[in-house]
């Protein structure tokens, strides 16, 4: 699959915030946060990492140049190595990724992306439930025809139907 292949589902349906989490730049920013956290932990465990190096990484972590990384990857033929080289070149130090494998990085970052994505979904779901509750309150006395087995049934109110949907169990029972 080409690096420039468009993900139709993401392009059409994902929110800007979700695309920021799962996009190339978002992933790189999370990787850099991960590397900095690991370097700090390694230093606290006695590995010789100068404070200036950590400060340098922190000062350049938001400088993402996808084109430069892509050019490095064309030479290294390894995506993670290219991102390591880019970050080290920006910081002027070579202390990240000590003792790590590519999978250590990518698996942890993927878990962070999943967590951030779920947090975003939770926020949006809560906002939707609040809106539904507001509408249920506003239109609580509106009479409508209930349905059972997709057939019209007795009269009920919009408030009752909305409340039913708001209180459905979410654990699959």
Q: Which stretches of residues belong to each language-model region?
A:
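Single conserved hydrophobic/aromatic residue that forms the stacking wall/gate
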Residues: 165-173
């Amino acid at each position: 699959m080409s690096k420039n292949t468009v993900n139709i589902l993401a392009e059409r349906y994902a929110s800007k915030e979700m695309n920021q989490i799962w996009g190339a730049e978002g992933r790189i920013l999370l990787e850099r946060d991960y590397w900095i956290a690991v370097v700090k932990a390694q230093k606290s465990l006695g590995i010789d990492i100068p404070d200036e190096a950590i400060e340098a990484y922190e000062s350049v972590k938001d400088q993402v140049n996808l084109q430069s990384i892509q050019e490095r990857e064309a030479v290294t033929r390894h995506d993670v190595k290219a991102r390591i080289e880019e970050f080290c070149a920006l910081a002027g130090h070579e202390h990240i990724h000590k003792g790590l494998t590519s999978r250590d990085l990518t698996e942890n970052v993927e878990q962070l992306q999943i967590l951030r994505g779920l947090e975003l979904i939770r926020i949006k779901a809560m906002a939707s439930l609040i809106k539904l509750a507001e509408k249920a309150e506003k239109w609580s006395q509106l009479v409508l025809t209930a349905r059972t087995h997709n057939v019209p049934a007795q009269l009920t109110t919009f408030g009752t139907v909305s409340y039913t949907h708001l209180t459905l169990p979410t654990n699959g029972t």
